[in-house]
C-alpha cells in the first residue's frame, strides 16, 4: 500500500525528530520551518521537499502535521495569506500535535470540514528522544472515521495512541494533565522554598514527604533542583506559563473559573518576569526562595 505524502510544519526539537522518524520509515515529507538549518537537516536525509508557502505545502500533501508553539501560530498558518485552509485538498487531514486552545481547534476543524478536510488534535506525551523512535504517547481526538484514516500513520509515530472522542478532546485532556502537573510542581517547589526560609533541611523534608502519599515522580523531579541543585530540563517555565494560561481560558470558555490555576499562573508569570522563562519548571524554587511580602 502506498504511503501518504506527509506535510510537516514546525521542525523544533520535537517536530524535527518526528520527521526523522517518518523518513526512516519511508515516508515522503514536505517540510516548512523558519529555521533553514532545521530544514537542511531534513533535506540531507532525502525523500523531502522544502516549501515556503503553507498553501502550496498543503496542496502537495495527503496529511499535514503541525508541531507549533501556540494557538496563535496555528491560526496564522491556517488562516493567513497562503495558509493551509486555502491549499488543503478534499479528503486530506490536518493533525495538530501542539498544545492548543480547544475552542480554536474546534473552529479550525469546522472551517476545514466545509472544504471536505478532516482534522485531528493530537497533543503529545514523552520526549523528543521518544519522537525519534516513534514511541510517543499521542492523545488524539476527532471524528472516528478521520481517526481511523490516520491511525496507521499515528501508530508509526507513537507507541501509545489514544482516541479520546470528538475534536478538541485531545487538547482539553492535555491542558487538564498539564494543569495538574504544573500546579503540583509549583506547590512542591514552594514547599521546599518555605522549608529553606524556615531553616528546615530540604533532604529531611523530602525524606518525610516521600515516605507518605505525597511521594510521586513530581516530588523526585522537584527534589533534584531544590535539594540537589540539578536542573534537568524537561519543560520550561515559559511553556508551563503558556499552558496554564490556556487552561484558565478553557475553564472560562466553559463558564467557570479556576482560582488554583490563576494563582499558579500568577507565580509562573512572576518567574518569567524574573528571568527564569527558559529554565525547567522546578527552578521556580529560586523565585519562591527570594519572594518577599
Where are these regions (language model features)?
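NAD(P)+-binding Rossmann beta1-loop-alpha1 motif at the extreme N-terminus of oxidoreductases
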Residues: 1-67, 92, 97
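Amphipathic alpha-helical hairpins
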Residues: 13, 17, 63, 69, ...
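Hydrophobic beta-strand scaffold residues
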Residues: 29, 50, 119-120, 161, ...
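Rossmann-fold NAD(P) dinucleotide-binding segment
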Residues: 54-66, 70-117
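Rossmann-fold dinucleotide-binding core
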Residues: 99-178
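Helical "substrate-binding/catalytic lid" subdomain
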Residues: 169-292
Amino acid at each position: 500500500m502506498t504511503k501518504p505524502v506527509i506535510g510537516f510544519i514546525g521542525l523544533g526539537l520535537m517536530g524535527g525528530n518526528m520527521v526523522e522518524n517518518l523518513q526512516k520509515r519511508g515516508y515522503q515529507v514536505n517540510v516548512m520551518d523558519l529555521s533553514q538549518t532545521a530544514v537542511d537537516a531534513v533535506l540531507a536525509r532525502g525523500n523531502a521537499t522544502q516549501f515556503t508557502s503553507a498553501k502550496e505545502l498543503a496542496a502537495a500533501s495527503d496529511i499535514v502535521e503541525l508541531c507549533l508553539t501556540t494557538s496563535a501560530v496555528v491560526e496564522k498558518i491556517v488562516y493567513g495569506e497562503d495558509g493551509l485552509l486555502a491549499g488543503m485538498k478534499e479528503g486530506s487531514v490536518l493533525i495538530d500535535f501542539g498544545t492548543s486552545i480547544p475552542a480554536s481547534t474546534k473552529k479550525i476543524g469546522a472551517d476545514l470540514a466545509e472544504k471536505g478536510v478532516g482534522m485531528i488534535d493530537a497533543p503529545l506525551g514523552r520526549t523528543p528522544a521518544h519522537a525519534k523512535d516513534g514511541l510517543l504517547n499521542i492523545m488524539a481526538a476527532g471524528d472516528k472515521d478521520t481517526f481511523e484514516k490516520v491511525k496507521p500513520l499515528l501508530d508509526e509515530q507513537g507507541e501509545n495512541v489514544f482516541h479520546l472522542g470528538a475534536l478538541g478532546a485531545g487538547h482539553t485532556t492535555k491542558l487538564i494533565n498539564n494543569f495538574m502537573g504544573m500546579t503540583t510542581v509549583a506547590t512542591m517547589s514552594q514547599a521546599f522554598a518555605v522549608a529553606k526560609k524556615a531553616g528546615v533541611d530540604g533532604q529531611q523534608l523530602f525524606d518525610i514527604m516521600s515516605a507518605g502519599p505525597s511521594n510521586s515522580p513530581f516530588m523526585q523531579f522537584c527534589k533534584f533542583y531544590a535539594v540537589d541543585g540539578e536542573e534537568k530540563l524537561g519543560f520550561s517555565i515559559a511553556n508551563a506559563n503558556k499552558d496554564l494560561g490556556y487552561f484558565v481560558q478553557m475553564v472560562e470558555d466553559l463558564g467557570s473559573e479556576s482560582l488554583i490555576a490563576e494563582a499558579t499562573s500568577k507565580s509562573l508569570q512572576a518567574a518569567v518576569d524574573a528571568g527564569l522563562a527558559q529554565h525547567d519548571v522546578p527552578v521556580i524554587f529560586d523565585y519562591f526562595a527570594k519572594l518577599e511580602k
